[in-house]
Design a protein with these regions (language model features):
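ABC family nucleotide-binding domain
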Residues: 1-118
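Conserved beta-strand-loop-alpha-helix hinge in the C-terminal portion
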Residues: 122-131
């Protein structure tokens, strides 16, 4: 949201739900997302990768059991895309969250534990990735 700084953007869902923002959770996410030194910046003062990390922070603020990520790296270069993917994987492991990600990027999809490919509205492939 363009008129809100990083902290305000990340805590918006908690505040809209009428709950108190957990300062410890906020600080943990700011550190995890490498946004501690940018917490008072507005979106137009952030890079595309930083803006995407703010969005991830907003999604993680409520500690959901399932994170839905629709093209989370769609507008990012390959370096920032990989950074975002690493953050999502870390969140998956650290907080035991299920990550459902929609992507057209085969390289990102191959980093998943399971791939379900959909073609013409039907499941074309469903496979568990063994490492």
């Amino acid at each position: 949201i363009p008129v809100l700084n990083v902290v305000e953007n990340m805590t918006l869902p908690v505040q809209m739900d009428g709950r108190k923002v957990g300062e410890e959770r906020l600080q943990e996410l700011l550190k995890l997302l490498n946004l501690e030194d940018r917490k008072n910046h507005l979106p137009n003062q952030l890079s595309g990768g930083q803006q995407q990390r703010v969005s991830i922070g907003r999604a993680l603020m409520n500690a959901p059991a399932i994170v839905l990520a629709d093209e989370p790296t769609g507008n990012l270069d390959s370096r920032n895309s990989q950074e975002i993917m690493e953050l999502l994987k870390l969140s998956n492991k650290k907080y035991s969250q299920t990550l459902v990600m929609i992507t057209h990027d085969e390289n990102l999809a191959l980093q998943a534990d399971r791939i379900i490919a959909i073609e013409d509205g039907r499941i074309a492939r469903d496979e568990v990735i063994r490492r």
